[in-house]
Amino acid sequence: MTASASSFSSSQGVQQPSIYSFSQITRSLFLSNGVAANDKLLLSSNRITAIVNASVEVVNVFFEGIQYIKVPVTDARDSRLYDFFDPIADLIHTIDMRQGRTLLHCMAGVSRSASLCLAYLMKYHSMSLLDAHTWTKSRRPIIRPNNGFWEQLINYEFKLFNNNTVRMINSPVGNIPDIYEKDLRMMISM
C-alpha cells in the first residue's frame, strides 16, 4: 500500500497544476470538472481508460473504450460519500495495476471528486489525510471538500490508521477542518 517513487515522479509526466481542465494527481489518476470529463480530445490525449462521475448533475458522453462508473452523490454536507471511499479506491487501484488511467470528476472538480481522491491516496499510498490534501492541492489548487465530506474523511483516516492528522474545530462560521483555520483568520481580518 505504500507509494512508489514513480507514482508521483515528475519524470512520469505529472504536469503542473491545472485549475480548469485535467489535473494529474498520480501517474494514473486525474481530477477534473464535468465539462473536461466530456472532452474527447482531453480524454484521449491523457489516455483515460475509466471515468468516475461523482455527481448527479453531470451527464457523461460515453466514448468507446472507456469504463464509466457513476457515484450519485450531491455536494451536500449530509451526503454519504464515505460508503464509496473503499469501492472507488479499490477500483482506481485495480485500474492502475492494469496500466489504466482513471479520471475522477464531479461538477467542478472541487469537493466530491477531490474527497474520493483523498480517500484513495490514504488507502493505497499510505498518506495521512493532511499529506493527501497537501499533495492534491499542489496538483489542483481549487480543491475544497465540503465540511460533511471532511468529517467523513477524518473518520476514514481513523479507520485506516487509528490516528487523525486533521480535526474539525469551532470557528465563527461553524465547524471547519483545522487546516483552514489560518485562511479563515485572514479572511475575517480583511
Swiss-Prot record:
Region (Sufficient for mitochondrial localization): 43-128
Catalytic activity: O-phospho-L-tyrosyl-[protein] + H2O = L-tyrosyl-[protein] + phosphate; O-phospho-L-seryl-[protein] + H2O = L-seryl-[protein] + phosphate; O-phospho-L-threonyl-[protein] + H2O = L-threonyl-[protein] + phosphate
Tissue-wise expression: Expressed in testis.
Active site location: 106 (phosphocysteine intermediate)
Keyword field: Cell projection, Cilium, Cytoplasm, Cytoskeleton, Flagellum, Hydrolase, Membrane, Mitochondrion, Mitochondrion inner membrane, Nucleus, Protein phosphatase
Topology relative to the membrane: Peripheral membrane protein
Transmembrane segments: none
Domain of life (superkingdom): Eukaryota
Domain called Tyrosine-protein phosphatase: residue spans: 21-162
Subcellular locations according to the entry: Cytoplasm; Nucleus; Mitochondrion inner membrane; Cytoplasm, Cytoskeleton, Flagellum axoneme
Cited Gene3D superfamilies: Protein tyrosine phosphatase superfamily
Main location: cytoplasm
EC number: 3.1.3.16, 3.1.3.48
Example GO molecular function: protein tyrosine phosphatase activity
InterPro entries on file: Atypical_DUSP_subfamB, Dual-sp_phosphatase_cat-dom, Prot-tyrosine_phosphatase-like, Tyr_Pase_AS, Tyr_Pase_dom, TYR_PHOSPHATASE_DUAL_dom
GO biological processes: flagellated sperm motility; peptidyl-tyrosine dephosphorylation
Gene Ontology CC entries for this record: axonemal A tubule inner sheath; cytoplasm; mitochondrial inner membrane; mitochondrial matrix; nucleus; sperm flagellum
Pfam family for this entry, one: DSPc
Entry's family note: Belongs to the protein-tyrosine phosphatase family. Non-receptor class dual specificity subfamily.
Function: Protein phosphatase component of the sperm flagellar doublet microtubules. May act as a regulator of sperm motility by mediating dephosphorylation of sperm doublet microtubule proteins. Can dephosphorylate single and diphosphorylated synthetic MAPK peptides, with preference for the phosphotyrosine and diphosphorylated forms over phosphothreonine.
Subunit: Microtubule inner protein component of sperm flagellar doublet microtubules.
Protein name: Dual specificity protein phosphatase 21
Name of the encoding gene: DUSP21
